[in-house]
Design a protein with these regions (language model features):
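Single-stranded nucleic acid-binding surfaces, predominantly the OB-fold ssDNA-binding core
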Residues: 1-100
Length: 100
């Protein structure tokens, strides 16, 4: 699996750094991609960290906007954490390559 990073050069919405896609290179998902990941500047704590949002579908219930995660852990969140770290590492590589 590879991660494709598309930088957010327009700066809109504020705080969004890039979009990410997972491209599957082997196994039953070979030739497919999973889109909808975004990398954001972390707003809380002022630590300058980064956050990854996962693909989700938004919908309304009684006028309230809600979100339904499309990629979910089966049992615990460690698998989700691994994908998050993979995307952040790919973004760091893309950022370093752009600065070089």
């Amino acid at each position: 699996m590879t991660v494709k990073i598309t930088p957010n050069d327009r700066g809109n919405p504020p705080g969004k750094l890039a979009d990410a896609e997972l491209h599957f290179t082997e196994g039953p998902l070979e030739g497919l991609k999973l889109i909808g990941f975004s990398i954001w500047e972390q707003r809380r704590g002022g630590g300058g960290g980064r956050n990854v949002t996962f693909p989700a579908r938004q919908y309304n219930v009684n006028g309230e906007r809600r979100s339904f995660a499309l990629l979910r852990p089966i049992v615990d969140t460690s698998a989700q954490d691994g994908v998050r770290e993979l995307i952040l590492a790919a973004y760091a590589e893309a950022e370093a390559a752009a600065a070089a």
